[in-house]
Regions:
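Conserved nucleotide-sugar donor-binding catalytic segment
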Residues: 2-85
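Residues that form generic nucleotide/phosphate-binding pockets
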Residues: 14, 95-98, 165
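A general structural signal for well-ordered secondary-structure junctions
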Residues: 39, 61-62, 105, 126, ...
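Catalytic core of nucleotide-sugar-dependent glycosyltransferases
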Residues: 67-75, 80-107, 126-138
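Structural register within alpha-helical repeat arrays
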Residues: 109, 113-116
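Membrane-interface aromatic/basic loop that binds lipid-linked glycans or pyrophosphate carriers
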Residues: 125-177
Length: 177
C-alpha cells in the first residue's frame, strides 16, 4: 500500500509492475557496493536493474512513504529514450542460477524480457525479440501483454505513439498488470 514504510519482504514481487526504487531516490551504504559491486560500465541501459538484483538478493530493502524524487517520463533526451538497438542491455543469463531458486526474481526479469522483446520487435529486430520471448515463463506475463506481443509491428508502433501521447498528458498505465 502507498502508506507502507519499512522493510519489504520481497523486493522483486513489490517492484511489479513498477520498481519501488529508482537510482535517484535511494540510499545505500558504501559497504554494500563494496560487497556486491558497483554499476557495470558495459551496460548502457539497465544498470540499476542489475544493481538491484545483486543488492536485493543479499540484503533487506526498506522503503519510505515520503516522496523523495519525481520521475519525469516526458523528458525528450533522457537515456530511456535511446533506441533499443543502440543500447547495451543486461545479459539475463547472468541471473539464471538465482532465478531458478527465486520465482519472484524470475517474474521480475520476465517483465523486463517482455518489455525488451516488444521494443526489439518495434525496432524490427525480430530474431532478438523472439529469443527473449522464448525465455519467458508465460504465466509470469499477463495474457493481454502476451497478446499485444503478437500484434503486427505497425500496430505496436501505433499503440506506442498513443501510449506516449497519453503519458505526456498525465495518463500513466502499464500493460504488465
Amino acid at each position: 500500500s502507498a502508506d507502507y514504510e519499512g522493510i519489504i519482504s520481497d523486493y522483486f514481487k513489490t517492484s511489479l509492475p513498477y520498481p519501488v526504487a529508482t537510482s535517484s531516490s535511494i540510499v545505500i551504504p558504501k559497504s554494500v557496493f563494496e560487497k556486491t559491486g558497483y554499476f557495470k560500465p558495459a551496460i548502457s541501459s539497465g544498470q540499476d536493474v542489475d544493481m538491484w538484483i545483486r543488492i536485493a538478493s543479499k540484503y533487506p530493502v526498506a522503503i519510505s512513504n515520503k516522496v523523495t524524487a519525481s520521475y519525469l517520463h516526458y523528458i525528450e533526451d533522457s537515456l530511456s529514450k535511446t533506441p533499443i538497438l543502440d543500447k547495451k542491455l543486461n545479459d539475463f543469463k547472468d541471473y539464471k542460477q538465482e532465478e531458478e531458486s527465486n520465482p519472484s526474481l524470475k517474474k521480475y526479469l520476465d517483465t523486463y524480457r517482455i518489455e525488451y522483446a516488444l521494443q526489439y520487435k518495434i525496432a524490427g529486430a525480430s530474431k532478438k525479440s523472439k529469443e527473449l520471448f522464448k525465455s519467458i515463463l508465460k504465466e509470469n506475463i499477463p495474457l493481454k501483454t502476451r497478446l499485444i506481443y503478437f500484434l503486427p509491428r505497425f500496430v505496436l508502433i501505433f499503440l506506442l505513439k498513443i501510449k506516449q501521447f497519453l503519458r505526456k498528458n498525465g495518463f500513466n498505465f502499464s500493460i504488465y498488470n
